[in-house]
């Protein structure tokens, strides 16, 4: 069936197109003769650029249009940055493949300062993420943190125009766009715990499409998949969208999973942290158990405030 064209639904930002092209190249390498086509689309998250993400309903903001295209048969797969993928999928769709993780860290970018520590009090730092905001505010309450929207190029332009003294971006995105020279300081997980799935590319498709799933199988990276499974299980139990102050990062150390997580008040005034270690086979159970601990230790109240009074169940 290699005469059939495999269609990839993708957003049109340079980073989204890089991810789609990456998957296209991997598929063509794994299956010589396979025809793969990109189907670029505009999502709601690409259109609403004048409002902080947390205020426009973060769940699925960048994926719903892509999912509709798959359900209607206009596309076979959708390629996502894993940190943008909601915890729930529409009926008939699922996450079937997670590619090898790139750099999961956040990156400090500035034209005048080499690190967060060098920023003078009152410096303006841009980020679109409540997770980054809460961690930065906790360590540097003297900084002014302002919302920053748009694709990577737009955000860098705003920095270069002097609207911000520094901005925080995902290291993987900068590296994929060959902009790693802009990184002044990669932030360790201890400095800024990454988002769920950060640095990994995920592939969603129809669950009844065995042909496509077979084609995708060689692209799955087992170690990344188990790490992201633990992170996502924790996030699911917390009922976290992609725009809540939740950080989660799993590492595999000698076959054992080490999962760290945090939930923070956006202003940095409260931070609930926890960690778990256990066998990789228990990835989901570890994630759920850690989420329960966080909820019991104050995360429930923090998230309820973020959700405007709608407490997680």
Curated annotation (Swiss-Prot):
GO CC annotation terms, alphabetical: cytoplasm
Note on cofactor: Binds 1 dipyrromethane group covalently.
Classification via SUPFAM superfamilies: Periplasmic binding protein-like II, Porphobilinogen deaminase (hydroxymethylbilane synthase), C-terminal domain
InterPro entries on file: HemC, Porphobilin_deaminase_cofac_BS, Porphobilin_deaminase_N, Porphobilinogen_deaminase_C, Porphobilinogen_deaminase_C_sf
Record-listed E.C. numbers: 2.5.1.61
Record field: catalytic activity: 4 porphobilinogen + H2O = hydroxymethylbilane + 4 NH4(+)
Modified residues (S-(dipyrrolylmethanemethyl)cysteine): 242
UniProt keywords, alphabetically: Porphyrin biosynthesis, Transferase
Cofactor(s) required, per the database record: dipyrromethane
UniProt signal peptide: none
Gene3D superfamilies attached to this UniProt entry: Periplasmic binding protein-like II (3.40.190.10), Porphobilinogen deaminase, C-terminal domain (3.30.160.40)
Family: Belongs to the HMBS family.
Other noteworthy facts: The porphobilinogen subunits are added to the dipyrromethane group.
Name by which UniProt lists this protein: Porphobilinogen deaminase
Organism, scientific name: Klebsiella pneumoniae (strain 342)
UniProt lineage: Bacteria, Pseudomonadati, Pseudomonadota, Gammaproteobacteria, Enterobacterales
């Amino acid at each position: 069936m290699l005469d059939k064209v495999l269609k990839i639904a993708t957003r049109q930002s340079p980073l989204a197109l890089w991810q789609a092209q990456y998957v296209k190249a991997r598929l063509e390498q794994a299956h010589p003769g396979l025809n793969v086509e990109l189907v670029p689309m505009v999502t709601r998250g690409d259109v609403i650029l004048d409002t902080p993400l947390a205020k426009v309903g973060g769940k699925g903001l960048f994926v719903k249009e892509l999912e509709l295209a798959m359900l209607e048969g206009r596309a076979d797969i959708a390629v996502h940055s894993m940190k943008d993928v909601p915890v729930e999928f529409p009926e008939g769709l699922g996450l079937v493949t997670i590619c090898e993780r790139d750099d999961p860290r956040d990156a400090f970018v500035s034209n005048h300062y080499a690190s967060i520590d060098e920023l003078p009090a009152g410096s303006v730092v841009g980020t679109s993420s409540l997770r980054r905001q809460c961690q930065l505010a906790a360590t540097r309450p003297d900084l002014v943190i302002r919302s920053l929207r748009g694709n990577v190029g737009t955000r860098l332009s705003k920095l270069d125009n002097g609207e911000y003294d520094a901005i925080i971006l995902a290291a993987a995105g900068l590296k994929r766009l060959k902009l790693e020279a802009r990184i002044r300081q990669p932030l360790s997980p201890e400095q800024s715990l990454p988002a769920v799935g950060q640095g990994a590319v995920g592939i969603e498709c129809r669950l009844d499409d065995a042909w496509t799933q077979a084609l995708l199988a060689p692209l799955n990276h087992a170690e990344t998949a188990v790490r992201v499974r633990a992170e996502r299980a924790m996030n699911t139990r917390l009922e976290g969208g992609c725009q809540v102050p939740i950080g989660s990062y799993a590492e595999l150390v000698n076959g054992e999973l080490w999962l760290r997580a945090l939930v923070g008040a956006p202003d940095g005034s409260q931070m609930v942290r926890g960690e778990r270690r256990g066998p990789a086979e228990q990835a989901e159970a570890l994630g759920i158990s850690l989420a329960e601990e966080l909820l019991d230790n104050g995360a429930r109240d923090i998230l309820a405030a973020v959700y405007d009074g709608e407490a997680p169940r």
